[in-house]
UniProtKB/Swiss-Prot annotation:
Name of the protein in its database record: Nicotinamide riboside transporter PnuC
Chief site of localization: membrane
GO terms, molecular function: nicotinamide riboside transmembrane transporter activity
Protein location: Cell inner membrane
Claim: ATP-binding is one of the keywords in the record: no
Family note: Belongs to the nicotinamide ribonucleoside (NR) uptake permease (TC 4.B.1) family.
Residues annotated to bind beta-nicotinamide D-riboside: W183, N187
GO CC annotation terms, alphabetical: plasma membrane
Induction per the UniProt record: Repressed by NadR.
Length: 226
């Protein structure tokens, strides 16, 4: 298959009209937020690339990792400017490496879907849920203490969102549907964390809506796999 054919399959095939409108509205909203409050062009780029990334993830498209890489680089500097140490460490040690690891993990587990390709999705077992809850709780308590010792801002909320992000990112790489439940919780918390940065605040609001759709769509992918 030629490069042009692969790009067409990835970005044109398998899209529903409302998904295209959904994505366009999110991007327009990001640009509007920057025009209204031009606080940081990096925040705008981070917001747009982040929205492209999560919408592609919700559809199970492997191209999400390209936009995820752009998001990771720009978001790091935005978090740095806000002194959110937990978010900075998340980008450096979770988001960046996971873009490369996730790409190769997904590449080996793709299937034809609605004229395009989508990832083969899985669902957590009861044992998996128990492990997730214990590890997330203990990890949050330990990381919040570390952030307080380092003098970070909003350490409780910052620490909680960081650990949830790590857990959700791992579930995403491993292709588990339940990542979306964590993303829903994370996006609600992040809306409060970034309340004073309009572009990022709006980005997480868009993420919240997309994560609801992502859970719905991945439930269909799990059923298709089974």
């Amino acid at each position: 298959m030629t490069l042009a054919a692969r790009l067409k399959q990835e970005f044109v095939s398998g899209w529903k009209p409302f998904e295209v409108v959904w994505l366009a509205l999110f991007i327009i909203a990001q640009i509007w937020a920057y025009v209204q409050t031009p606080d940081s062009w990096l925040a705008m780029i981070s917001g747009i690339s982040g929205i492209l990334c999560v919408v592609l993830v919700s559809k199970g498209k492997i191209s999400n990792y390209f936009f995820g890489l752009i998001f990771a680089y720009t978001y790091f500097y935005v978090a740095w400017g806000s002194n959110f140490l937990g978010e900075m460490n998340t980008v450096l040690y979770v988001y960046l490496p996971s873009q490369f690891i996730g790409y190769f993990m997904w590449k080996a587990n793709m299937q034809n879907s609605d004229g395009g390709e989508s990832v083969i999705a899985k669902a957590l077992t009861v044992k998996g849920w128990m492990t997730l809850i214990v590890v997330t709780t203990v990890g949050t308590l330990l990381f919040v203490q570390a952030l307080q010792a380092a003098g970070g801002s909003s350490t409780g909320l910052d620490g909680l969102t960081t650990i949830i992000t790590v857990a959700a990112q791992i579930l995403m790489i491993l292709r588990y549907r339940e990542q979306w439940l964590l993303w829903i919780g994370l996006n609600i918390l992040s809306i409060f964390l970034w309340a004073e940065t309009p572009a990022i605040y709006l980005m997480y609001s868009a993420y919240l809506l997309n994560s609801l759709y992502g859970y719905y769509n991945w439930t269909k992918l799990v059923k298709r796999t089974n």
